[in-house]
Amino acid sequence: MLEQMGAAAKAASYKLALLSSREKNRVLEKIADYLEGQSEQILLANEQDLAEARANGLSDAMLDRLALNPARLKSIADDVRQVCNLADPVGQVIDGGLLDSGLRLERRRVPLGVVGVIYEARPNVTVDVASLCLKTGNAAILRGGKETWRTNAATVKVIQQALEECGLPAGAVQAIESPDRALVNEMLRMDKYIDMLIPRGGAGLHKLCREQSTIPVITGGIGVCHIVVDDSAEIEPALKIIVNAKTQRPSTCNTVETLLVHQDIADTFLPALSQQMAESGVTLHADPRALALLQDGPAKVEAVKSEQYDDEYLSLDLNVKVVADLDDAIAHIREHGTQHSDAILTRKLSHGNRFINEVDSSAVYVNASTRFTDGGQFGLGAEVAVSTQKLHARGPMGLEALTTYKWIGYGDDTIRA
């Protein structure tokens, strides 16, 4: 089955690579229209997925992530239309010039070819990834979470109908419908067809892909994010940033998980933090020095275990640790961070610059929330993932990250001397 899917995707990728921006936008507009016009079958499939998820005892938070309704589906369709408005990077000349040999050389952006994505149980990801891949002239093979396999299958069928209406092969966007986990292992070895693989899930999935895949893998999305409260931080602005970074959407990978508080500000800052976290419903997990300053406050607090510094909570839980100085804070981030997003709150320019230069994360912030690590917030439009590695992309992966480049030489019967 996967062999046939791979061959179909590769064949489709050659046709997609030749499309103009106008033609690709026409396809995306058609997909958006079809998602709205054929919403009933997608919503019916989603109801079946939700019923099975409830029977399996999934949490209310997870059920909310799985659920679609007419308003959410319209929002997803509108997101596809927004992709139409993004600049198409394909065909862009990055650089070039005339060489001494007389050869005119240029480096031009081109599609990757076939992109494989393994992702969690969020039905919107199916459409997001498909639209970004099509905009950049790539075919896509998608393997969504087993909790939404019916929703994903119904959504991809609608996308394929739109593709065929525009004269393009259905193989341009395909979904592995079976929830059989063995198919993931098979997908990881499809280097004959898939040019890049992006896993969007937990640490276990990322580890599996790194160890088993014969395809280049872009990993990321696991966010053990930190905020350092420097000794010069102003308490009220700092609390505002921390509340935003922790409570706006706790289940996202750019949510702060550990707070590192300078010892010289801890006595005044931590009681204020306790009050704010109590109002926000956040449970604090504190080291001994922080615990002594928090235990009489209104926030729920308990002693932190060392392994919790490596946890991506994705919930209203926050580690709090008192550090001796900026060196101590940076050392902690180097040991426990995931190179996703880290921030410092300071009024000392020198400390901000040190943090920028010494914390090796895909996004670092000075006096700002970690929640900004997002394709839309960065002005990239939608994103296919957030990469925490250094090759081939880093940070939010927008359209440009779904391209590579080729060297093109124009000669006049030119030969090498």
Curated annotation (Swiss-Prot):
Q: Which domain of life is it from?
A: Bacteria
Do you know which Pfam families this protein is assigned to? Aldedh
Question: Matching CDD domains, A to Z?
Answer: ALDH_F18-19_ProA-GPR
Q: Name one GO molecular function term.
A: NADP binding
Q: Which GO terms describe its biological process?
A: L-proline biosynthetic process
Q: In the Enzyme Commission scheme, what number(s) does this protein have? A: 1.2.1.41
The metabolic or biological pathway listed in the UniProt record of this protein is: Amino-acid biosynthesis; L-proline biosynthesis; L-glutamate 5-semialdehyde from L-glutamate: step 2/2
Q: Report the principal subcellular site.
A: cytoplasm
Read off the Gene3D superfamilies from this record. Aldehyde Dehydrogenase, Chain A, domain 1, Aldehyde Dehydrogenase, Chain A, domain 2
- Give the location in the cell: Cytoplasm
The record's keywords, sorted A to Z, are:
Amino-acid biosynthesis, Cytoplasm, NADP, Oxidoreductase, Proline biosynthesis
List GO terms (cellular component aspect).
cytoplasm
Q: From the UniProt record, list the reaction(s) this protein catalyses.
A: L-glutamate 5-semialdehyde + phosphate + NADP(+) = L-glutamyl 5-phosphate + NADPH + H(+)
Protein family (similarity comment): Belongs to the gamma-glutamyl phosphate reductase family.
Q: Which NCBIfam families match?
A: PRK00197.1, proA
Outline what the protein does.
Catalyzes the NADPH-dependent reduction of L-glutamate 5-phosphate into L-glutamate 5-semialdehyde and phosphate. The product spontaneously undergoes cyclization to form 1-pyrroline-5-carboxylate.
What is this protein called in UniProt? Gamma-glutamyl phosphate reductase
Species of the source: Enterobacter sp. (strain 638)
